[in-house]
A protein has these predicted regions:
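Glycine-rich, often proline-containing surface loops adjacent to acidic residues and nearby aromatics
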Residues: 58-59, 101-103, 132-139, 184-198, ...
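Long, charged, mostly alpha-helical binding arms that flank functional sites
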Residues: 158-205, 219-222
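Long, contiguous binding/interaction regions
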Residues: 111, 255-278
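Internal mixed beta-strand/loop scaffold within catalytic domains of large alpha/beta enzymes
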Residues: 46-136
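Compact, glycine/acidic-enriched structural inserts
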Residues: 129-172
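A generic structural motif
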Residues: 4, 113, 129, 140-146, ...
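Gly/Pro-rich turn-and-neighbor structural signature
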Residues: 2-86, 200-250
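Flexible loop/turn segments at secondary-structure boundaries
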Residues: 70, 115-116, 228, 253-257
Length: 278
């Protein structure tokens, strides 16, 4: 049995509120400014943006939108192993021309220090016609990777996923967060999943992923935030950010879905850093 739209919206808003509260505390000087927006075709959302001391720019957005025609087509077929994990993209004929509902939380944090990693989190729920599924993921993009930080981040995700899901979803992240024209990964990975058919068990799993985010990320910030850096480090960080921008504008599913579905432009481009160079 799938959860109700109201249950999912409430859970996602609660997740947004917990993350915003903890990251505000961590920043120590800035605060998230919330701004409501409405989508002309139906629904809307709430932007929460931080311009802080520790975090040069960050955003944690909630959205809940609906419309008459689903703007994208699911990709690929699931293997038997994927089916065991609950992964099954609906067939194109199931969703073509169908009304849709989508709600989710999307976060990206761009720290000021080159030694504190960029982080991304997304959880989402989509209904199209009679089909309903969850998707999401989280990944780490350090300019200067530390093995112990990568191990901690992935360890927290393995704990919440279990071995089988972690193996599939971490590989999915490696494949998804890949910048083809650069022939390189965006960062040090994480997890990515999509088309998890909606059920109470999957709903709980997605909530658990959201709750694991702070455990995975906050210790890394606390460990690196006082590390000194040079102007050369800063300039290299800005050039590295260019790859983040390239991925988000060319490949990111959330960006493309938002643009195709008439989403809020400010919220869609919230993921972009405030300063970047090539």
């Amino acid at each position: 049995m799938k959860p109700s739209r109201t249950e999912v919206e409430q859970a996602f808003r609660g997740l947004r509120d917990r993350i915003v509260a903890r990251l505000t505390e961590l920043d120590g000087g800035g605060r998230f400014v919330r701004k409501d927006w409405e989508r002309p075709g139906g629904g809307g959302g709430e932007m929460s943006e931080l311009r802080g001391v520790l975090f040069e720019k960050g955003g944690c957005n909630f959205s809940s939108v609906h419309g008459e025609r689903y703007p994208t087509v699911p990709e690929g077929k699931a293997s038997e192993a994927d089916l065991r994990l609950g992964i099954r993209a609906p067939a194109p004929e199931e969703v073509a021309g169908q009304p849709f509902f989508a709600t989710g939380v999307s976060l990206v944090m761009h720290p000021r220090s080159p030694f504190v990693p960029v982080v991304h989190l997304n959880v989402r729920y989509i209904e199209v016609g009679q089909a309903a599924w969850f998707g999401g993921g989280t990944d780490l993009t350090p300019f200067a990777p530390f093995e112990e930080d990568t191990a901690h981040f992935h360890g927290a995700l393995r704990e919440v996923c279990g071995d089988e899901r972690y193996a599939r979803f971490s590989q999915w992240a490696k494949d998804y967060f890949f910048i083809t024209h650069r022939n390189s990964e965006r960062g040090v990975g994480g997890i990515f999943f999509d088309y998890l058919r909606a059920s109470e068990e999957i709903f709980q799993f997605v909530q658990n992923v959201g709750d694991a985010f702070l455990r995975a990320y906050v210790p890394l910030v606390e460990r690196r935030q006082l590390t000194t850096y040079t102007e050369n480090d800063r300039q290299n960080q800005l050039r590295w950010r260019g790859r983040y921008v390239e991925f988000n504008l060319i490949y990111d599913r959330g960006t493309l879905f938002g643009l195709k579905s008439g989403g809020n432009i400010e919220a869609i481009f919230m993921s972009l850093p405030p300063l970047v160079s090539w």
